[in-house]
Amino acid sequence: MKLPQAFYARDTRTVARALLGKVLVHLDGGVRRAARIVETEAYHGPDDRASHARAGPTPRAAIMFGPPGRAYVYLIYGTSHCMNVVTGPEGFPSAVLLRAAEPIDGCLHSTRGPGNLCRALAIRREHDNGRDLAGDDLFVEDAPPPSEAVVTGPRVNVGYAGAWAARPWRFALRGSPWVSRPPPGAAAARAARAPAAPAPRPRRPRGSGP
């Protein structure tokens, strides 16, 4: 079942977490391309210095100011597309970046990282930007809540955003090999769960008895 618009019409950070484990689907010329979402980032409101919306409703970011449940697809580095889903109430510019996913059907490329994910599912700005995610070609399917724990951390490559760069608004499924970059603390958490190494046996002094 496709996620309804009401799913997206919530706080961006809530949606970013709730999208983990859901399935992104693109019906590309009759070919189903699908992947399970394992990593997201929230971009919340016009004051978020890491968000495109900080400059207002520019031609590029205008979709973020529109109704929730739309695809916001843009180009970075002139070569890679990134897909976001617009969230929150209309007029409050917010979106969730889909950073990585686990391949399921018809993926053309690695799905680790936002540019790779769009390439794998053949998602392109010229065809998919502004698309209603309740439509027939590009949508997110519901799925049971993930069994994996959710880890959080700062967003990637937003050092220009000052204090906003440290907000823990990146969400990922712990242990997924498809996450683009494990959030800080994930490795430490894995190490903490690992069994402790046995203590070395003390050496017996020479000449001592059994």
From Swiss-Prot:
GO molecular function annotation: alkylbase DNA N-glycosylase activity; DNA binding
E.C. code: 3.2.2.-
Keyword annotations: DNA damage, DNA repair, Hydrolase
Region of interest called Disordered, as start-end residue ranges on this chain: 180-210
Nucleotide-binding is among the record's keywords: no
Biased composition (Basic residues): 201-210
Bias kind Low complexity: ranges: 186-196
Keyword Hydrolase: yes
Gene3D superfamilies, sorted: Methylpurine-DNA glycosylase (MPG)
A Pfam family it matches: Pur_DNA_glyco
UniProt cross-references to InterPro entries, sorted A to Z: Formyl_transferase-like_C_sf, MPG, MPG_sf
Signal sequence range: none
Entry's Gene Ontology BP terms: base-excision repair
Lineage: superkingdom: Bacteria
HAMAP family: 3MGH
Family: Belongs to the DNA glycosylase MPG family.
Protein name in UniProt: Putative 3-methyladenine DNA glycosylase
